[in-house]
Swiss-Prot record:
Upper classification of the organism: Bacteria, Pseudomonadati, Campylobacterota, Epsilonproteobacteria, Campylobacterales
Name of this protein: Ribosomal RNA small subunit methyltransferase G
Function noted in UniProt: Specifically methylates the N7 position of guanine in position 527 of 16S rRNA.
UniProt entry keywords in alphabetical sequence: Cytoplasm, Methyltransferase, rRNA processing, S-adenosyl-L-methionine, Transferase
Gene3D superfamilies: Vaccinia Virus protein VP39
Cell location: Cytoplasm
Length: 185
């Protein structure tokens, strides 16, 4: 169970996302119900993943999964990689509104992030951004040796990456969560 303040933050986040989405098309979510489902989807892996203190979310878009995770885990530090200006501006706005002092936005592509500035992370997340193998190849240098990837993928994940073991995945409805230790890559 999360503290009451988290639910207030989720509501503010959802309202702001829908407001911005009307103008800037940040996400496919068009109702508060779909935003709340996306929030639940973002938080679901907290049930079974190892605890973490640092996380990079690649292709943060409208804030899923990073903003809900940052709200739920205020003791962890989050770096959001989002190169598109309208989305990085939205993320910066919501961080200020919610006073998420544990989050920073980097308006840059993952290919251009300097390793000297971002490294030794516990967790890297991404939701439906690119092919899993390509994403892992581009970002594994940022993980610590005991770090993990948590990729939020759709049902095409199995076609996208047939060599990746299904034992490394867990599912909920049409979502596949790929959770992999960096030493096993």
């Amino acid at each position: 169970m999360l503290p009451e303040v988290c639910y207030k933050h989720f509501t503010i986040f959802g309202d702001e996302l829908l407001k911005w989405n009307k103008i800037h098309n940040l996400t496919g979510a068009s109702s508060i119900e779909s935003v709340m489902e996306n929030i639940f989807d973002s938080l679901y892996p907290l049930r079974f993943i190892d605890d973490f203190t640092s996380c990079m979310d690649i292709g943060s878009g409208g804030g899923f999964p990073a903003i809900p995770l940052a709200i739920a885990k205020p003791q962890s530090h989050f770096i959001l990689i989002e190169p598109r200006n309208k989305r990085s501006c939205f993320l910066q706005n919501i961080i200020i509104q919610l006073e998420l002092n544990n989050v920073q936005v980097r308006p840059i592509r993952i290919q251009d992030v300097p390793i000297a500035e971002v490294n030794n992370l516990d967790l890297i997340t991404s939701r439906a951004l690119m092919d899993a193998k390509e994403l892992i190849s581009l970002s594994r240098k940022f993980l610590k040796s005991e770090g993990y990837f948590l990729l939020y993928k759709g049902t095409r994940f199995r076609q996208e990456t047939p060599s990746m073991s299904i034992e490394e995945c867990f599912t909920r409805e049409n979502r596949i969560y790929y959770y992999k230790h960096s030493r096993d890559l």
